[in-house]
Amino acid sequence: MTMEQGVKAGFAQGLALLLPPTSAVMGILLLVPVAPQMMQAFSDVPGVDFLVPILLTLPGLCIALFSPVAGLLGDRLGRRRLLIGAMLVYGLAGMAPMLLSDIYQILASRVVVGVCEALIMTLCTTLVGDLFSGRARERWLASQTAVASVSALLFLALGGLLGRQGWQGPFLIYGLIWPMALAVLLLVREPPRVERQVPGWSALPGRHVALTSVTTILAATLFYTIQINVSTVLPDFGITDPARIGLFSAVASIGTPVGSLIFWTVARRDVRLLLGMEFALMAVAFIAMAHAPDAAWFIAGAFVGQAAAGLLLPTLLTWAMSTLAFEVRGRGMGLWQSAFAIGQFMSALVVPALAVATGSTVDAFPIIAAGSLLVGLMSLLLLFRSRWSPA
């Protein structure tokens, strides 16, 4: 299949593809406020302390495992119909626990949710690459990061509000995916293509995909390290009230959409320069958090780190997409989504291990900062080396 260059799409199409990827945020954060209630409701089930956290994280694991398959299906079968079908099934599987009373059946429904999330995330991003180019593509990809961050705050609040009606309440929100599916159906068209045999995996630019995937794993690990650990470190500064912890965490999270908006103004810069500066800024944030004298300074450091992430993620996404031909773009984006999900999983392993070795989570931050700074310096070195090399 080949696509004509310069496919025209406007604001309506961009918006229709901007909202569905919030499903990945929805999949995790909606249930965070009701996790204690679920543990109580299934307290007679052996291993419930293990099973309930698995309910929250299982969709993320499915994204890591199935995103490359989702990309392959998108390349072979087309993007739009597969996306709409995944969104419809996502709504059904997401709301299913409202009618289920067996935790293992709920676990099964969460697997379906995760597979659908892999399809939705991969195909929406791929379609943005298909339908937009140049600055428009960069801005819509940056907007995905910003909207996902803002939606995280919304879904946490909605989860807590509906959780007052019982642990099943938040599952109702999964039905919001259906109006989004209708918008995709009405507004988005499959990109024009000429049918021919779809090339194999070898058609992917292997070196480029490997480099962007490894860098994305590192970036996602840093991003989620801040997101996950802000609320766990704040009690060390005497902030123990859940409402205040939520407020402080929300302030830090605002940094991500701010960074994504800044990306709009710098997106045309050399990617090596951007990555160098962004990883260096992330290192500054971790140093600031490690040496913060009080909660306000700690949150200021976290805000800087989230802003760096808001710059870093769309940089990586546009870089990953830059060399992908239409015929393999789905698989390339699937591998990128998989790498991002692996980074999320890695953050839950790396930080506790470093905390054990250093004595606390905060004491581990300088080591993380050093790693981030090293990646940034390597990126800048590659930039300067290319500029100093003789033509």
Role assignments for model-derived ranges:
Residues 12-43, 226-231:
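Extracytoplasmic
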Residues 34-64:
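Extracellular/periplasmic helix-loop-helix junction of adjacent transmembrane segments
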Residues 64-102:
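Conserved MFS/SLC helix-loop-helix module at the cytosolic interface between two early adjacent transmembrane helices
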Residues 66-78, 258-271:
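Helix-to-loop junctions at the C-terminal end of transmembrane segments
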Residues 89, 93-96, 104-112, 296-304:
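Paired small-residue
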Residues 103, 109-148:
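Cytoplasmic helix-loop-helix junction between adjacent transmembrane helices
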Residues 134-135, 143-188:
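Helix-loop-helix hairpin linking two adjacent transmembrane segments in secondary transporters
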Residues 323-359:
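A late C-terminal transmembrane helix in Major Facilitator Superfamily
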